[in-house]
Amino acid sequence: MTTGKSPADNSYLDTLDQIIKDTIAPAAEDIDQTGAFPRAAIDALGQAGLLGLISAREVGGLGEGHRTATLVVERIASTCASTAMVVCMHYAATAVIEAHGPNAAREAIARGEHLTTLAFSETGSRSHFWAPIGTAKSVDGGVQIDAQKSWITSAGQADSYIWSSRAQATDGQITLWLMPADARGLRIPQPFNGLGLRGNFSSPVTAEGVIIASDSLLGADGGGFDIMMGVVLPYFQLMSAGFCVGTMNAATNKTAQHVTRTKLEHMSQSLADLPTVRAYLSRMRIKTDMARALLLDGLDALEQGREDAMLRILEVKAAAGEAATEVTDLAMRVCGGAAFRKDVGVERHFRDARAATVMAPTTDVLYDFIGKALCGIPLF
């Protein structure tokens, strides 16, 4: 992705590219086949300081923000979507810890020794992550947490979860907690075995009488919604769009390679010599670049404090998610029967792209939010 702006020190991109070449790319197909967690990639990113990409310099991090996090996720997604989603969730959760978490956790993340993730969606409220059913109540020894989380990326692999619950003191409000992943009473009912993103370990997690320290509170009791909207949402929306752009770009490039190299020997032509094939490929490129252009404008809007910044934040994931579905559909169509073979490579991107429209906030929810914003109706 052309970032639109160049960080003062972008040597981390060279480091990232080397990790992608040496560690992420060689493991991508195996992760998809077996559903293994990309532990080697996460360890390599941690050792290189990239898990601390958005951690403040004062705690040893790189001190970067939305733009660079989005770029990193996009680059990884073009090679391994599972690894990219793990990193996306880590950065979104890290943003909360940076804003409201303890220095010990911040420093561990900056050192590359701590992987974190979000734990918002629940069985009882599905993709309406702003309406947790799970509870928190003060007890002897701390706070008791009970909940049924429907999806947590890196479940059982992360070191901590940014965990949402109903507020203790105020009905209808949300509270966030820094939940140790090894807390007694946390249980993963079933392992993840999905259509796409097969190595991201997005499993349900149940909390039954989990006791955590009272100082695990992130922000104020009842202040979770504002943190979700003000801290998490911009990071998650932008990085999710970057994830989609990376996936689309990979699918488009692989499709172009396939049609260029594949011959119709009886006609002494390649598939690329067919106007219909070129037209479909052009649509793929245009859709990818349109999503990228909106993403870059969203980043600009946020950084410049424009009035339309929140509208753009809502738009980027909706647009990129729909585009990713369309572009990877076209990749399968253009590559024909060969697309169903693993060696062409586009079917993996086709499966991985399906997640973008259903991850909360889903595309349909975003369409509703955008429509409300345009009509001057409160979102909630």
Cite the ranges covered by each PLM segment.
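C-terminal helix-coil-helix/basic helical segment that borders enzyme active sites and/or dimer interfaces
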Residues: A25-Q33, T288-A319, M332-F340
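Glycine-rich flavin
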Residues: A36-Q47, L51-T153
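A short core secondary-structure module
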Residues: Q148-R187
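Glycine-rich phosphate/pyrophosphate-binding beta-alpha loops
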Residues: S150-A155, L233-M239, A356-M359
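Glycine-rich beta->alpha junctions and the first turn(s) of the following alpha-helix
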Residues: G194-K287
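Alpha-helical scaffold segments that form or flank carboxylate-/histidine-based iron centers
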Residues: L233-Q237, A272-L281, A309-A319, E347, ...
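Alpha-helical transition-metal enzyme core signature, strongest for iron centers
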Residues: V245-M248, T252, M284-A291, K317-V327, ...
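Glycine-rich phosphate/cofactor-binding loops in nucleotide/flavin-utilizing enzymes
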Residues: C335-F380
